[in-house]
Amino acid sequence: MINDERMVAFINSFDKGNTSFLNQIEKEARADAVPIIRTETQTLLRFLMAAHRPMEILEVGTAVGFSALLMQEYAPAGAHMTTIEKYEKRIPIARENFKRAGKE
Protein backbone atom coordinates (compact mmCIF):
# COMPACT_ATOMS: atom_id res chain seq x y z
CA MET A 1 0.00 0.00 0.00
CA ILE A 2 1.32 3.44 -0.92
CA ASN A 3 0.95 5.83 2.03
CA ASP A 4 2.97 8.96 1.27
CA GLU A 5 0.52 11.54 -0.12
CA ARG A 6 3.17 13.18 -2.31
CA MET A 7 4.09 9.81 -3.81
CA VAL A 8 0.42 9.00 -4.43
CA ALA A 9 -0.09 12.41 -6.09
CA PHE A 10 2.99 11.85 -8.27
CA ILE A 11 1.86 8.38 -9.34
CA ASN A 12 -1.69 9.58 -9.98
CA SER A 13 -0.34 12.35 -12.24
CA PHE A 14 0.40 9.59 -14.77
CA ASP A 15 -3.11 8.11 -14.56
CA LYS A 16 -4.76 7.74 -17.97
CA GLY A 17 -7.74 5.86 -16.59
CA ASN A 18 -8.98 2.48 -17.73
CA THR A 19 -11.04 1.25 -20.63
CA SER A 20 -14.79 1.13 -20.13
CA PHE A 21 -14.54 -2.68 -20.00
CA LEU A 22 -12.05 -2.60 -17.11
CA ASN A 23 -14.13 0.07 -15.37
CA GLN A 24 -17.13 -2.27 -15.59
CA ILE A 25 -15.19 -5.21 -14.12
CA GLU A 26 -13.90 -2.98 -11.33
CA LYS A 27 -17.42 -1.73 -10.57
CA GLU A 28 -18.79 -5.31 -10.46
CA ALA A 29 -15.93 -6.48 -8.24
CA ARG A 30 -16.35 -3.62 -5.77
CA ALA A 31 -20.11 -4.24 -5.62
CA ASP A 32 -19.35 -7.86 -4.68
CA ALA A 33 -16.64 -6.83 -2.14
CA VAL A 34 -13.87 -8.45 -4.22
CA PRO A 35 -10.49 -6.81 -3.59
CA ILE A 36 -9.22 -4.84 -6.58
CA ILE A 37 -5.90 -2.98 -6.78
CA ARG A 38 -6.13 0.72 -5.98
CA THR A 39 -6.01 3.44 -8.61
CA GLU A 40 -2.41 4.43 -7.86
CA THR A 41 -1.35 0.78 -8.00
CA GLN A 42 -3.08 0.44 -11.37
CA THR A 43 -1.20 3.51 -12.61
CA LEU A 44 2.14 2.21 -11.32
CA LEU A 45 1.47 -1.19 -12.89
CA ARG A 46 0.70 0.40 -16.28
CA PHE A 47 3.93 2.41 -16.04
CA LEU A 48 6.01 -0.65 -15.13
CA MET A 49 4.47 -2.69 -17.94
CA ALA A 50 5.26 0.04 -20.47
CA ALA A 51 8.80 0.54 -19.13
CA HIS A 52 9.84 -3.11 -18.85
CA ARG A 53 7.66 -4.72 -21.55
CA PRO A 54 7.78 -8.22 -20.01
CA MET A 55 7.17 -11.19 -22.27
CA GLU A 56 6.35 -13.56 -19.38
CA ILE A 57 4.05 -12.55 -16.51
CA LEU A 58 3.02 -14.55 -13.44
CA GLU A 59 0.14 -13.23 -11.36
CA VAL A 60 -0.65 -14.86 -8.03
CA GLY A 61 -4.17 -14.10 -6.86
CA THR A 62 -6.39 -13.57 -9.89
CA ALA A 63 -9.60 -12.76 -7.98
CA VAL A 64 -11.90 -11.78 -10.89
CA GLY A 65 -9.12 -11.18 -13.43
CA PHE A 66 -9.01 -7.39 -13.21
CA SER A 67 -5.23 -6.99 -12.74
CA ALA A 68 -4.43 -9.66 -15.32
CA LEU A 69 -6.60 -7.92 -17.92
CA LEU A 70 -5.04 -4.57 -17.03
CA MET A 71 -1.55 -5.99 -17.53
CA GLN A 72 -2.54 -7.67 -20.80
CA GLU A 73 -3.65 -4.31 -22.18
CA TYR A 74 -0.14 -2.95 -21.66
CA ALA A 75 1.88 -6.09 -22.35
CA PRO A 76 3.80 -6.30 -25.63
CA ALA A 77 2.36 -8.37 -28.46
CA GLY A 78 3.12 -12.04 -27.94
CA ALA A 79 3.51 -11.75 -24.16
CA HIS A 80 2.36 -14.78 -22.15
CA MET A 81 0.55 -14.48 -18.82
CA THR A 82 -0.07 -17.16 -16.23
CA THR A 83 -2.45 -16.28 -13.43
CA ILE A 84 -3.61 -18.44 -10.54
CA GLU A 85 -6.41 -18.25 -7.97
CA LYS A 86 -7.04 -20.56 -5.02
CA TYR A 87 -10.52 -19.30 -4.03
CA GLU A 88 -12.66 -21.59 -6.17
CA LYS A 89 -15.75 -19.36 -6.12
CA ARG A 90 -13.86 -16.65 -8.02
CA ILE A 91 -12.34 -18.85 -10.72
CA PRO A 92 -15.52 -19.05 -12.89
CA ILE A 93 -15.95 -15.27 -12.61
CA ALA A 94 -12.36 -14.68 -13.73
CA ARG A 95 -12.80 -17.12 -16.61
CA GLU A 96 -15.96 -15.33 -17.70
CA ASN A 97 -14.18 -11.95 -17.55
CA PHE A 98 -11.31 -13.32 -19.66
CA LYS A 99 -13.87 -14.67 -22.13
CA ARG A 100 -15.69 -11.31 -22.24
CA ALA A 101 -12.35 -9.64 -22.97
CA GLY A 102 -11.48 -12.14 -25.70
CA LYS A 103 -8.44 -13.29 -23.71
CA GLU A 104 -9.50 -16.86 -22.96
Please give the residue ranges for each predicted region.
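A short alpha-helical cap/connector motif
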Residues: M1-E104
